[in-house]
From Swiss-Prot:
Keyword Cell cycle: no
Protein name: NADH-quinone oxidoreductase subunit C
Assembly information from the UniProt record: NDH-1 is composed of 14 different subunits. Subunits NuoB, C, D, E, F, and G constitute the peripheral sector of the complex.
Keyword Cell inner membrane part of the UniProt annotation: yes
Organism: Methylobacillus flagellatus (strain ATCC 51484 / DSM 6875 / VKM B-1610 / KT)
Subcellular location: Cell inner membrane
Function: NDH-1 shuttles electrons from NADH, via FMN and iron-sulfur (Fe-S) centers, to quinones in the respiratory chain. The immediate electron acceptor for the enzyme in this species is believed to be ubiquinone. Couples the redox reaction to proton translocation (for every two electrons transferred, four hydrogen ions are translocated across the cytoplasmic membrane), and thus conserves the redox energy in a proton gradient.
Swiss-Prot/TrEMBL catalytic activity: a quinone + NADH + 5 H(+)(in) = a quinol + NAD(+) + 4 H(+)(out)
One Pfam family cited in the UniProt record for this chain: Complex1_30kDa
Enzyme class: translocase
UniProt xrefs under InterPro entries: NADH_DH_suC, NADH_quin_OxRdtase_su_C/D-like, NADH_UbQ_OxRdtase_30kDa_su, NADH_UbQ_OxRdtase_CS
GO molecular function, one term: NADH:ubiquinone reductase (non-electrogenic) activity
Keywords in alphabetical order: Cell inner membrane, Cell membrane, Membrane, NAD, Quinone, Translocase, Transport, Ubiquinone
Amino acid sequence: MTRLEQLKQHLQDVFGNSITRLQECRNEVTIECQAPCLLEVANLLRDHKLLKFEQLIDLCGVDYADYGEGSWSGLRYATVYHFLSVSLNQRLRLRVFAPDDDFPVLPTVVDIWPVANWFERESFDLFGIMYEGHPDLRRLLTDYGFVGHPFRKDFPMIGNVEMRYDPERQRVVYQPVTIDPRNNVPRVIREEGFHHG
């Protein structure tokens, strides 16, 4: 039995029906769970003697609108957690979808892995995913007056406001975007169009 097969077996033994999906792809294991089970699953991932994922390496938000060929019919927003077990030398990815696309909320894991604090703030700022119970959920990368969440797929590519220096006021001012919207479809050079010679 390989290490990945052993990890998958341990995950199935420990979680049973608490995980809704277990997948191996490119020598990496990904599991999914429902949002109400997140804290239970997270605590077991960290504390169970067969798992020992004591390190949260990264956490990121994902917007699955128009995922793949546009045929995605699942929930829109997810948080993806990347874990490392230093003592067992294994890695794991956990994906949890927020149950409400209009107001995505997941429980915070800051009490389990304190490093999640700024990761969750970044995910909130860029995707608008709320983390219930977070000690200080406020914007991290965008300005305090910023409108919207720039990594959402429905956010306008040119933004909503632009800032410029106003020499009369001697400060930076915000104004509505003056750039005309345009179709930003990438141009593809097909292989048959290359000149080989």
